[in-house]
A protein has these predicted regions:
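Short glycine/serine- and small hydrophobic-enriched flexible loop segments
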Residues: 63-71, 128, 167-174, 265-266
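Active-site SXXK
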Residues: 40, 52-83, 241
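Structured C-terminal helix/loop/strand segments within mature extracytoplasmic catalytic/sensor domains
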Residues: 1-24, 42, 134, 173-196, ...
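Active-site-adjacent helix/loop patches that line small-molecule binding or acyl-intermediate pockets
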Residues: 2-10, 84, 91, 95-189
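Short, conserved catalytic-motif segment at the N-terminal edge
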Residues: 19, 26-50
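Solvent-exposed coil/turn segments that connect beta secondary-structure elements
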Residues: 35-39, 48-50, 68, 85-87, ...
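Active-site-proximal beta-strand/loop segments in catalytic clefts of secreted hydrolases
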Residues: 35-37, 84-85, 114-118, 126, ...
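Short amphipathic alpha-helical face segments that pack within enzyme cores
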Residues: 59-64, 164-167, 259
Length: 273
């Protein structure tokens, strides 16, 4: 267990670090959200700033399928084939494993590839499966609305705040949306993520972390966005950390996320009682 004292002093250290990094002109915007998952303190930095979620939306997409699978377990063994003809969105962080053309995959295999390797080809197959059926498409929309990811008036899902996205991990951790089996399935896949930079790099290797990153690059204005959010399973006192960034250089954004992860872990570790 760790102390539940205020994080005010640490917040000032974090703010100082962020201000220094913003002077480099490589970091344009950043949001940070922290929550002690054992009824402890919460703090946020620019937590209502909006970012493009990109691959972060793979988590709620997987939640749509597992929500259905609670009542239709056969859904996870249903097989679909990847033709390889659809355009796959560009990824700065290339997946180490990806769905292969002219190959049959079960829904569960595609869900796993989507989260562990952030594979866009697998995501495309899952989205096509949803889009082919009006009832499935409606279920996706209703699920996203329930998770607070779509404004019911505008049907827009173009932007997301760090606080809003972090709530998904609280739902999974507290088993508040999916049942225990399905919540654990998602968290285990996220714990197997092959993205070893960002949050993961700021935490000792023996500490489990279930996280998802998202990245977006616009060639028109040379602006990059990189985000990493997850649960760090500090012994007997897990915590939630989510960092969203916008800047000109992916390496800089990765470095900033890693350093903030290090700062938070060291602060949490110093509070051990």
């Amino acid at each position: 267990m760790i102390s539940k004292a205020s994080y005010d002093n640490f917040y000032y250290q974090l703010e100082k670090y962020i201000n220094e990094e913003e002077q480099s002109n490589e970091l344009y915007e950043i949001s940070v959200y922290f929550r002690d998952l054992k009824n402890g303190p919460i703090f946020g930095f620019n937590e209502l700033t909006e970012f493009i979620p990109a691959s972060l939306l793979k988590v709620p997409t997987v939640m749509v399928f597992l929500n259905s699978a609670e009542n239709q377990p056969e859904l996870l063994t249903y097989k679909i084939s990847y033709t390889g003809t659809t355009t796959v969105a560009r990824q700065e962080v290339k997946p180490k494993e990806s769905a292969k053309p002219n190959t049959l995959y079960t829904i569960e295999e595609l869900l796993r590839l989507t989260l562990i390797y952030s594979d866009n080809a697998s995501l495309n197959m899952l989205q096509t499966f949803l889009n082919e059926n009006p009832q499935r498409l409606k279920l996706r929309e209703e699920t996203f609305q329930e998770l607070g990811l779509i404004d019911p008036r505008t049907k827009s899902e173009n932007t997301l705040t760090v606080r809003g996205y972090a709530s998904l991990f609280r739902l999974l951790y507290n088993v508040s949306f999916l049942n225990a089996e399905m919540s654990e399935k998602i968290l285990q896949w996220l714990a197997e993520s092959d993205y070893q930079i960002g949050l993961r790099a700021g935490v000792p290797g023996n500490i489990k972390i279930a996280h998802k990153f998202g990245e977006r690059f616009f060639e028109s204005d040379d602006v990059r966005q990189l985000h990493d959010c997850g649960i760090i399973y500090y012994p007997d006192n897990p915590y939630l950390l989510c960092v969203m960034t916008k800047g000109s250089d992916f390496n800089k954004l990765q470095s900033v996320i890693q350093h903030i992860s290090e700062m938070v872990y060291e602060e949490v570790d110093s509070r051990k009682i």
